[in-house]
Amino acid sequence: SEKRAKGENDKIINKKVSSALKNNLKVIFCIGETILQKRKKMTKKILLNQLNKGLYKIKKKENILIAYEPVWSIGTGLVPKSEDLNHVISFIKIFLRNKMKFKNPKVLYGGSVSPQNISLLRKVINLDGFLVGGSSQNSKKFIDIIKKTFI
């Protein structure tokens, strides 16, 4: 999501995904909207566009995880409300199953994940895990997240 915000286009992202899969790598495909797009109620449209273009003609879907990473949330400490996050994750999974033929889509949350919000994020029922960014660079914070997730 951050790369898109800095100008990396969908065609380049699609080539990177294709190349990674051809080399038997797992892919975490990040999608997300900016704060302006969110305010304009464009989240679904933006996510569909990113999925359609970024995964265009991709075959090995079982090696892809999707990370919903709202650009407006990354590193800010701001997190979508649980019900909003649940709604977006459900929307992504339904689209992946029905339109992109994913058998069992896995969706991670990759906005601001921290020791302070991990307990709330864990309550989002259809979330399959987390893509931890800044907090993973601090061992104490990262261990705290792990403990609160698994213990």
Where are these regions (language model features)?
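Active-site loop-to-helix "anion-binding N-cap" substructures in soluble metabolic enzymes
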Residues: 1-151
